[in-house]
């Protein structure tokens, strides 16, 4: 299995999906209760697996193995389709990659102090982080696959230790708590939605698996089941250990991962747990960075190929890494602003776009070997949910829905 490309692709999908923000997810669901948190997570997982499988369906019509999503968008919606697909992808991925580079540099800069040495400057750490990890992306999907397998083992070990300390402390009464306000379930949907955003690497995975529909489909199902299981178990541990009143206290005092870790550390009595959580967060940040940059690389490669621009690895490396690196070094605030729209961009690229592509594909190619179950009714239903998810942040901003952490 370790040499299996399908398994490797599943780990890349899982690694891209499980970001450093996963551990703070219980703060988003603090007022919802465990039961409704499970329902929301499973529902959004099913929705985004469905949209991922729509990409598998559409990729059956790709003219070349290395065609990107933007090329498919142009094929079915003309130049406007390519522009929308390319802009939404690159703005989202550049914003995320700049955030990951800044976060990775921050972690690396403080690493020497653990060995009694002087801290590294943040800018130096950012450059080292980008060059070292970026080299695996430049090699291609195979390089990311190899490193992701190693890092994933580290994440599993760290996560298992945290669960080992917390699960024995779970109280059933805490898990039975009802939402403080049922509107919290609606408000949390866009944040949890982005926690299943693996679609940015669809082109890379399809190419890596040689266009095999069955392998592609299996990689999505396995690769998304892993984060779903991790999210559910982590929610079980935190909601089971912390009561609703304790969650409210955290949100009032320190609504961050540190606040959550400190609260659970008090209950478990493990002072080592905070360090393990930091290790997990670091590894999750790295695997997410690798997946996101792979998406940038493939998106730019598809764009350059379309307009007959230089498409070698050197040019792609400069175009992929230079913009987020410059912003991470000199103007991180600009990407913080862009990140505030990440949910909207993710909803468009991960749901609205594949629905539109599948709709046109079914009209023009009615006899394709593989078609996602549900017919056009499922397409319309998923589209309506996508529109609602895109509107929710505005309803929160206008005061019609309560705000949640995240």
Where are these regions (language model features)?
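TM-loop-TM module centered on a large, flexible mid-protein loop between adjacent transmembrane helices
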Residues: 67-79, 227-286, 306
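Membrane-interface "cap" regions at the ends of multi-pass membrane proteins
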Residues: 1-27, 36, 49-53, 64, ...
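A generic transmembrane alpha-helix motif of multi-pass inner-membrane proteins
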Residues: 333-406
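Hydrophobic alpha-helical segments of multi-pass membrane transport proteins
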Residues: 158-162, 283-295, 317-323, 342-367
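Helix-loop-helix junctions that connect adjacent transmembrane segments
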Residues: 116-128, 142, 149-262, 404
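Hydrophobic transmembrane alpha-helices that form the core helical bundles
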Residues: 50-59, 65-116, 278-303
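Loop-to-transmembrane helix boundary motifs in multi-pass membrane proteins
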Residues: 5-6, 120-130, 222, 226-229, ...
């Amino acid at each position: 299995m370790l040499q299996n490309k399908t398994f490797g692709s599943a780990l890349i999908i899982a690694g891209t999906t499980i970001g450093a923000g996963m551990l703070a997810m219980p703060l988003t669901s603090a007022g919802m209760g465990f039961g409704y948190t499970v329902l929301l997570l499973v529902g959004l997982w099913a929705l985004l697996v469905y949209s991922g499988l729509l990409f598998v369906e559409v990729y059956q019509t790709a003219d070349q193995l290395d065609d990107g999503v933007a090329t498919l968008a142009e094929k079915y919606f003309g130049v406007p389709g390519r522009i929308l697909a390319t802009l939404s992808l690159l703005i989202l991925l550049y914003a995320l990659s700049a955030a990951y580079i800044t976060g990775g540099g921050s972690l690396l800069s403080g690493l020497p102090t653990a060995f009694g040495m002087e801290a590294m400057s943040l800018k130096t750490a950012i450059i080292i982080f980008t060059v070292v990890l970026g080299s695996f992306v430049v090699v291609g999907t195979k390089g990311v696959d190899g490193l992701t397998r190693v890092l994933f083992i580290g994440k599993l070990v760290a996560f298992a230790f945290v669960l080992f300390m917390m699960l024995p402390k779970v109280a059933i009464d805490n898990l039975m708590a009802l939402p403080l306000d049922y509107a919290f379930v609606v408000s949390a949907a866009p944040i949890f939605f982005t926690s299943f955003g693996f679609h940015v690497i669809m082109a890379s995975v399809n190419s890596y698996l040689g266009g095999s529909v069955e392998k592609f489909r299996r990689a999505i199902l396995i690769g998304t089941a892993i984060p779903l299981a991790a999210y559910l178990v982590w929610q079980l541990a935190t909601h089971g250990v912390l009561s609703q009143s304790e969650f409210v206290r955290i949100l009032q005092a320190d609504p961050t991962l540190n606040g959550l870790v400190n609260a659970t550390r008090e209950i478990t009595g493990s002072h080592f747990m905070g360090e393990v959580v930091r290790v997990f967060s670091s590894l999750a940040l790295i695997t997410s960075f690798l997946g996101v940059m792979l998406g940038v690389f493939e998106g730019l490669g598809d764009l350059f190929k379309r307009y007959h621009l230089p498409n070698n690895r050197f040019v792609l490396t400069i175009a992929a890494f230079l913009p987020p690196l410059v912003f991470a070094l000199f103007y991180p605030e600009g990407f913080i602003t862009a990140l505030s729209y990440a949910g909207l961009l993710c909803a468009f690229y991960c749901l609205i776009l594949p629905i539109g592509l599948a709709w046109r594909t079914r009209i023009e190619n009615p006899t394709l070997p593989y078609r996602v179950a549900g017919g056009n009714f499922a397409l319309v239903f998923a589209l309506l949910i996508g529109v609602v998810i895109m509107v929710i942040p505005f309803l929160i901003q206008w005061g019609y829905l309560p705000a949640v952490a995240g």
